Amino acid sequence: MINITEAAQTHFAKLLANQEPGTQIRVFVINPGTPTAECGVSYCPPDAVEATDTELKFDQLSAYVDELSAPFLEEAEIDFVTDQLGSQLTLKAPNAKMRKVSDDSPLAERVEYVLQSQINPQLAGHGGRVSLMEITDDGFAILQFGGGCNGCSMVDVTLKEGIEKELLNMFPELKGVKDLTEHQRGEHSYY
């Protein structure tokens, strides 16, 4: 479910040494399965462990996850990275905003999952997003752009060179992608 690197375990172990004996960590998701989902890590004293929690045992500590957060923390990773600027804890949870879908899920669900978990995080850097409106009977994914992508002069490149290539590579049953957006250039547009 969650991978906690050795560096992160060592970091947590140092922090836990200053806490009440038996205290571990809790990994959670606030608003799981929504665009506003946020992940967090907190101390988990022994009296805060619930019967429905999942305990994940690691070499240096245990991490507790509540049952509501668990499916959204699949493939999550916690790391402690050090570079020239200092050290920081990173928590990557690709499924926090949307549950991972299985390979035999309907095509629309699988495409939507890729858009939300892989494409939109890249577009978010420009204040943009894309949504799947439908998959046509002839195999085209109809998309709608929003935020900084609406009216952006680079949207055609993003659509054809980025999104379409990635989706066609992952879903050979698709014939292509089309943009439904009525682009209105404005201050919100990235380029």
UniProtKB/Swiss-Prot annotation:
Spell out the InterPro entries in the cross-references: Fe/S_biogenesis_protein_NfuA (IPR017726), FeS_biogenesis (IPR000361), FSCA_dom_sf (IPR034904), HesB-like_dom_sf (IPR035903), NIF_FeS_clus_asmbl_NifU_C (IPR001075)
Which superkingdom? Bacteria
- Which Gene3D superfamilies does the protein's record reference? Fe-S cluster assembly (FSCA), HesB-like domain
The cofactor note reads: Binds 1 [4Fe-4S] cluster per subunit. The cluster is presumably bound at the interface of two monomers.
Q: Name one GO molecular function term.
A: iron ion binding
What are the GO BP annotations of this UniProt entry?
iron-sulfur cluster assembly; protein maturation
- Obligatory cofactor(s): [4Fe-4S] cluster
Sorted keywords for this record are: 4Fe-4S, Iron, Iron-sulfur, Metal-binding
Record: residues binding [4Fe-4S] cluster: C149, C152
Q: Summarize the subunit comment.
A: Homodimer.
Of which family is this protein a member?
Answer: Belongs to the NfuA family.
Relate the protein's function as given in its record. Involved in iron-sulfur cluster biogenesis. Binds a 4Fe-4S cluster, can transfer this cluster to apoproteins, and thereby intervenes in the maturation of Fe/S proteins. Could also act as a scaffold/chaperone for damaged Fe/S proteins.
This one is known as Fe/S biogenesis protein NfuA
User: What is the primary gene name for this protein?
Assistant: nfuA
